[in-house]
Amino acid sequence: MGDTELELSPTHLEELQKSPSTSTTSSLSLPSSPSSGPHPLTSSSPSTSEGLPTSSPPLDVISEGLGELSLVIDTEVAKKACQEVLQKVKFLKGDGEVSSASSEPILANGTAHPEANDGGQPPKISEEEVEPIKSVRRRQKNNSSKQSWLLRLFESKLFDISMAISYLYNSKEPGVQAYIGNRLFSFRNEDVDFYLPQLLNMYIHMDEDVGDAIKPYVVYRCRQSINFSLQCAWLLGAYSSDMHISTQRHSRGTKLRKLILSDELKPSSQRIRREVPQPPPPYPPPLHHGPGMSEHSLSPSKRTHQRSKSDATVSISLSSNLKRTASNPKVETSQDEPVRLTPQREFIKSLMGIGKRLATLPTKEQKTQRLISELSLLNHKLPARVWLPTAAFDHHVVRVPHTQAVVLNSKDKAPYLIYVEVLECENFETSSVPVRIPETQIRSTRSVENLPDCGITPDQRASSFSTVPNYDNDDEAWSVDDIGELQVELPEIHTNSCDNISQFSVDSITSQESKEPIFIAAGDIRRRLSEQLAHTPTTFRKDPEDPSAVALKEPWQEKVRRIREGSPYGHLPNWRLLSVIVKCGDDLRQELLAYQVLKQLQIIWEQERVPLWIKPYKILVISSDSGMIEPVVNAVSIHQVKKQSQLLLLDYFRQEHGNFNTEEFLTAQRNFVQSCAGYCLICYLLQVKDRHNGNILLDSEGHIIHIDFGFILSSSPRNLGFETSAFKLTSEFVDVMGGLDGDMFNYYKMLMLQGLIAARKHMEKVIQIVEIMQQGSQLPCFHGSSTIRNLKERFHMNLTEEQLQVLVEQMVDGSMRSITTKLYDGFQYLTNGIM
């Protein structure tokens, strides 16, 4: 049976009005207890229309002159019903409650009866007072109906992580917040990870009930993953930095961060031997089980670790661990496996330290030389149980090809781009770390002693990342079978790769190729001839003022092939090449926010089948002034294009992709239009500023990609608000589209309209990402009280599609004719040399 409300019928009310009463009791309540107040008059017990057993003790009695009207309810049933209601939702406030301890009759609207104390006269309920009672009952019924619908929504398939975050942020009911916190376990890890900044920001800056709902999930995931633990620690530190120093020291975010970094959240049963794979821990006890939530829907992850071939025969050597401890006083003496977080933290700290030291050097040439030297020394600490957090697969870092690193363009700082060789593995936490392959086995090298000092002692060169040694003689390295494979394959590599790059010499990149014979298969010759017959994109010349241009222009696949041929690990089938940009002195929290909005809009446009193209790139926030960025491969800035080619954009397109009517040019033109429309909408919605040609990339397929979202929403360069147009649309962009009268330009405007209609259909998904991050934030993009309101207004929810079309036409026309865009480009050319 459904829920039944215990209420006075109209018949009973009429009898109360007509008949005198000797009782002043007009309340219906549970027997009072020391701690319990009045209870809502709702119950999930069966209907009382046919009466309950008279032998049960009465809950309360209403007696009126003509006889006694008894309402008898089983006490245990009533208590159980109230407990169920309180545990499920706790929505009702009990507007019609009456305290049984009071002798004064209280009406349903909460006011005392005016005749209650008048000479002991019985209370009378007038017709005017019946209406408020009825309205209260109607509200209670509506609330009950809303609760039912809310529970059905929470348990439906439509309830996704975006809705969960929204209810967690907006709900003020602890019961609902606890329920949502429990439901986090039922979502995929990747889906929750996308909203990790929002979850942790709510944990830091919102009330205690929200924090209590979020913490069990965060703690559980930290026990399962080193990578998740470190990302939580980094984000907690970054988002707590806006608090006052005295408050920050004792905040919940700081306490949780210290708990994570203390490594107290490691799995309860440490694996001393790795022959036996451990199943995932049991699902933690829920705070509030919701109806319909099955156990299988709440299991956090179905993936279990499956052993690699190396793990089958390898166990941790305790003597090896003790040996490491003796050589490194920082390592705590323990017979358990080494501290989980230390190697990765030391690796990231080393990369950040390089960036800080580069910023102190005056010229770009000195920065480049220092970068190559520092990275070559870093290689002596590899391989290790370290990884790049921006990658999408598990791996171990084995080598950094130092001669390929470049310093990027920056006026005051020294961001740099590195390429990282990794070996893909099944689980970087449990898979064996690869054995170090000395470079002398397969190539000629210069001795370590010939390296520039860079302020690093020989002892530091030989040391490793805290607990992770060089693994040359470590038991936890390769299995016997793996070593056998190496011994079989190494001679082949040695004889066929005589033109490999010298390890520490930039000059030998070109000199080694002519010194030794190269053996090439006939199939390779045929393949290279066919590739030469095809159209080959141009290359950039070396520019001492911009060394990154040549590296970024080189096709990615060609770079991978070249670096693999020169790597001692390149023969291994699980070898992969990754790249990352390291930034020091920059706050990447706004970049992370922009990435989330771009990713959400990309998903929306894909769902709505709008062919807009954007490229969100991953952002890793390490602290409030450092982080890592995923590079966009096969792309160079429009500034570099114009500087290197000295051509207009349309002429460069013809040079790269052929004449106007070729299939390659038409494909590149369509890619340009779809990406330009997508980023124009992004720039309008987020009010992206600082749109000079150094911050707009052009890839090998014709797409444009906007980078550097340091000025969005309420912030602008130097807070001047100089760029007033909705987005950047220059005459060169229009020329690539075929001119104002071309079909592709009309296609561009049509895509703008379709994209805006689709975006406003899902506006709340975008708004909540930004709104939650505004809590407790001191970021420049949130300056002013109207940031969120202005963002909502740019979705134009009140306009018809015809009015939206007029708006798009006006924005396009205004952006093309914007004088401030031309002035800002001129300002950047005069001050920074950006073309």
Curated annotation (Swiss-Prot):
Residues 277-288 have a biased composition (Pro residues). Keywords: ATP-binding, Endoplasmic reticulum, Kinase, Lipid metabolism, Membrane, Mitochondrion, Mitochondrion outer membrane, Nucleotide-binding, Transferase. It catalyses: a 1,2-diacyl-sn-glycero-3-phospho-(1D-myo-inositol) + ATP = a 1,2-diacyl-sn-glycero-3-phospho-(1D-myo-inositol 4-phosphate) + ADP + H(+). Residues 706-730 are annotated as: Activation loop. Its EC number is 2.7.1.67. It comes from Danio rerio. It is a peripheral membrane protein. Residues 687-695 are annotated as: Catalytic loop. The gene is pi4kb. Belongs to the PI3/PI4-kinase family. Type III PI4K subfamily. This is Phosphatidylinositol 4-kinase beta. Its cofactor is Mg(2+); Mn(2+).
